[in-house]
Amino acid sequence: MQQLNPSEISDIIKKRIEKLDISSEAKNEGTILSVSDGIVLIHGLADVMYGEMIEFANGTYGMALNLERDSVGAVVLGDYEGLAEGQKVRCTGRILEVPVGNELLGRVVDSLGNPIDGKGELGNSLTSPVEKVAPGVIARQSVDEPVQTGLKAIDTMVPIGRGQRELIIGDRQIGKTAVAIDAIINQKHTGIKCIYVAVGQKQSSIAAVVRKLEEHGAMDHTIVVAAGAADPAAMQFLAPYAGTSMGEFFRDRGEDALIVYDDLSKQAVAYRQISLLLRRPPGREAFPGDVFYLHSRLLERASRVNADYVEQFTNGEVKGKTGSLTALPIIETQAGDVSAFVPTNVISITDGQIFLETNLFNSGIRPAMNAGISVSRVGGAAQTKIMKKLGGNIRLALAQYRELAAFAQFASDLDEATRKQLEHGQRVTELMKQNQYSPMTVAEMGTVLFAANEGFLDDVDVNKVVKFEAQLLDWMRSEQKELLDKIGPEGNFNDDITAGLKAALEKFKTTQSW
């Protein structure tokens, strides 16, 4: 055995110390205890924040959701098959963020903002946290500007304002998505940017929506955030929050945006799945206790902010402009049960709801909106002049018709006034029908509603009302373009326009017999 001198020992120690690599980076690392169904239990992560991104050994990211004394429960944002017990996990020190900005317009991205449309990488470096606190009361402004959906039934009876949350609720396959897509298509010339968030839908359905938006030239002002049925529950849970952050980019810079969540029922189911796997106590319908907060903190971010807020946010770059984010959440009911847990929650959070009914849809009334129980709590202040003036009579005519129609089933002989009201109501009901992907301008809607209110439809055969409307609008566009321009997108309405519309309709009625 070789003997070492004391001096040699000190030299060896010195060399070892010189070679020692002392890194200044302190890593907060933990170890995976278990992996199952996209949920990972981790031991040893000391300084982790709620909602913080954590990185796994295979490069996949996760999000910390359960912070317990001895362990951390996290959801994996992506594929979890490569993860195994004993692998190292490290904190990133960052809250989950997604890309935002104009570069996203026209693109299809996943819940993390990664492009999935095969059009290459995004060119921007601007990001925003997925979870943000909604603007306070002082930062907000009242809703007084309209969002035109282009659908007569909605713009007349349940008007939507910029910054409003209007729920679209109904059973499956009765046109909820169709209403939202028509609203997006109608924003082509309004400057409103749109975000369509697809949660838990078939990939074929999402592809069909994207194709329709492209066909109608609406993809240029739209971002599609897709979390399909095959995506992990964590991605379906995050998609609405990611889409909202993208919409807030426009709102906070003094622009207007519209976001559609299709649909929040599937997001609630995904969150229920995550919560049960994280062993959180189940409540009503096995949903966790904070499912109301899940949707309230999301929908409160849709708002109209005042000019001071925008100026402060942009450091004085944008002055004198208000911004808005309008939300159209969709909820799917089971057999028309609107008293279930999630539907009642979202009804109480939103500023109104559009009820779509199966029996109306099956009887050919599309959009299948029940005008009696559909309501807009704040949109009335945002309605254009012509719609406000004419819309009330339309709602009244439909309400009277519903009441009399039920009564007329049992009465054999009706007096003249009742019969007239019934016939008028039938024609107004027929007039509210509208084909998909054919939104109307404010001036066109105003003309048609004026015709109904002034009795120009009363001598038209019920089966010819739709034909009458189409031919009237074609005639107005060719013969009375100046009058339509006078009404304009602002919905102007005065004595001159009233006289002009009366004269035009009388002239049109003489062109052929109805």
Swiss-Prot record:
Lipid bilayer topology: Peripheral membrane protein
Signal peptide bounds: none
Compartments in which it is found: Cell inner membrane
One Pfam short name: ATP-synt_ab_N
The EC number(s) this enzyme carries: 7.1.2.2
Site (Required for activity): residue numbering on this chain: S374
GO cellular component, one term: proton-transporting ATP synthase complex
Catalytic activity: ATP + H2O + 4 H(+)(in) = ADP + phosphate + 5 H(+)(out)
Annotated binding of ATP, by residue: G170, D171, R172, Q173, I174, G175, K176, T177
Main location as per UniProt: membrane
GO molecular function list: ADP binding; ATP binding; proton-transporting ATP synthase activity, rotational mechanism
Assigned keywords, A-Z: ATP synthesis, ATP-binding, Cell inner membrane, Cell membrane, CF(1), Hydrogen ion transport, Ion transport, Membrane, Nucleotide-binding, Translocase, Transport
Family: Belongs to the ATPase alpha/beta chains family.
Function per UniProt: Produces ATP from ADP in the presence of a proton gradient across the membrane. The alpha chain is a regulatory subunit.
Quaternary state and interactors: F-type ATPases have 2 components, CF(1) - the catalytic core - and CF(0) - the membrane proton channel. CF(1) has five subunits: alpha(3), beta(3), gamma(1), delta(1), epsilon(1). CF(0) has three main subunits: a(1), b(2) and c(9-12). The alpha and beta chains form an alternating ring which encloses part of the gamma chain. CF(1) is attached to CF(0) by a central stalk formed by the gamma and epsilon chains, while a peripheral stalk is formed by the delta and b chains.
NCBIfam families: atpA, PRK13343.1
Name by which UniProt lists this protein: ATP synthase subunit alpha
Gene name as annotated: atpA
